[in-house]
Regions:
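Proline/serine/threonine-rich low-complexity linkers at boundaries of modular beta-sandwich domains
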Residues: 1-2
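Acidic, Ser/Thr
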Residues: 21-28
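Surface-exposed, short loops/turns at beta-strand junctions within beta-sandwich domains
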Residues: 63, 68-80, 90, 194-199, ...
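Hydrophobic/tyrosine-rich beta-strand signature of extracellular beta-sandwich/beta-rich modules
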Residues: 81-85
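Preference for solvent-exposed, low-hydrophobicity sequence contexts
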Residues: 100-101, 120-204
Length: 204
């Protein structure tokens, strides 16, 4: 297995310390009569890490390995890290009579497993002081519940979303008190402007 202490959606430009944990299974010989041991493969020899920060080959013949990256800056999109494991030749299987049975598993490489951290820009909403909504994939539908009173103290309810979402068409819906359905509102009543947040183009 290959796991990471950081995963899922993270804000672009945020700094993370990431620890990767690898557990290697040598498999088993079943049934195991009189072989030297019941493991199908030999011990691991090297753990091969790859990712946006480059590659590293770590010599290690134990079944677990750990790698830590400190101060990693989350990039936009997929930040994919992987690890493959090289292992030595396995034990010679034996038959119930103690004879060699087939051949030992040759030395080889366990195919790489990967974890992905997705860097995204946040979406903000609110009146006056805006707050971030939970991070989500760029281009997916942004759904926020507006308050009944959309103007407070001269400030209007506002949504700010990065331009990577600009291919989406904003829609405002209001619940119809009679039908209880959600009706689309006239978008000409709403203003969409270009703004900049920390150097990132946004729509508001």
């Amino acid at each position: 297995s290959f796991t990471s202490t950081v995963n899922g959606f993270k804000e672009v430009g945020s700094i993370a310390d990431i620890t990767f944990n690898v557990n290697f299974s040598r498999g088993s010989i079943t049934p195991q009569y009189s072989a030297e041991n019941n493991y199908r493969s030999g011990s691991p020899t090297t753990y091969n890490y790859n990712g946006p920060v480059g590659s590293e080959v770590k010599a290690n013949n134990t079944l677990t390995d750990t790698k830590t990256i400190t101060g990693y800056s989350i990039a936009i999109g997929n930040n994919t890290f992987s690890c493959s494991v090289d292992y030595s030749i396995g034990t010679q299987p034996k038959s119930s009579k103690g004879n060699d049975y087939n051949s030992p598993l040759p030395a080889g490489t366990l195919a790489a497993k990967s974890v992905t951290i997705t860097g995204v820009y946040p979406v903000y909403n609110g009146i006056g002081t805006l707050s971030k909504i939970p991070l989500q994939a760029h281009g997916t539908a942004i759904a926020v519940d507006a308050p009944a009173d959309m103007v407070v103290g001269g400030n209007r309810f506002t949504i700010q979303y990065p331009n990577v979402w600009s291919g989406k068409t904003p829609i405002v819906q209001q619940e119809n008190e009679l039908s209880k359905a959600w009706d689309n509102q006239n978008m000409s009543e709403y203003e969409i402007t270009d703004i900049n947040i920390s150097g990132v183009p946004y729509k508001q």
